[in-house]
């Protein structure tokens, strides 16, 4: 992997993922942030090590190159859950069913988050239903398989120690 380091800004250029900025993170979490053309929030790689080699770079590159497709798949998963399990979003059956019938499900501002191996998520930071405030709704995957949809309203921000 060809990496050029800018020591002052903690930015590396990764051959497959572009420029990655190492973010100061709490505790033993290491976070790299990258950009995705056309996707305002970009992506994060969150690891237990600062070594990017533990990330599945080829997998991440494939997801971010096809980010719009994956965003649409995640929105379709949300649409199904709104209709079948509105309680996941703390919504009534009627509100969930009505939201699921909208032409565009009102979830926006996707941020792609990758972990070790092929675990990843798309976190929709904003939505028109007031769900998941203030952290959003996370659609989680292992590889291409959906593993869960989570309302992040009960999440807590991790503070530096």
Where are the model-predicted features located?
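Acidic, proline/glycine-rich low-complexity IDRs
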Residues: 2-33, 102-161
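Surface-exposed, interaction-prone regions used to assemble/regulate multi-protein complexes
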Residues: 52, 62, 69-70, 80-132
């Amino acid at each position: 992997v060809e990496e050029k380091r800018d020591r002052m800004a903690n930015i590396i250029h990764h051959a497959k993922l572009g420029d990655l900025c190492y973010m100061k993170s709490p505790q033993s979490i290491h976070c790299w942030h990258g950009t995705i053309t056309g996707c305002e929030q970009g992506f994060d790689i969150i690891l237990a090590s600062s070594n990017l080699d533990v990330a599945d770079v080829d997998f991440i590159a494939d997801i971010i190159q096809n980010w719009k497709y994956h965003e649409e798949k995640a929105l379709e998963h949300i649409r199904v859950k709104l209709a079948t399990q509105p309680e996941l979003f703390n919504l009534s059956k009627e509100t969930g069913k009505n939201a699921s019938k909208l032409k565009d499900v009102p979830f926006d501002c996707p941020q792609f988050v990758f972990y070790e191996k092929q675990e990843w998520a798309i976190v929709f930071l904003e939505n028109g239903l007031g769900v998941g405030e203030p952290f959003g709704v996370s659609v989680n995957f292992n590889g291409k398989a959906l593993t869960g949809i989570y309302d992040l309203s009960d999440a807590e921000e991790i503070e530096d120690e």
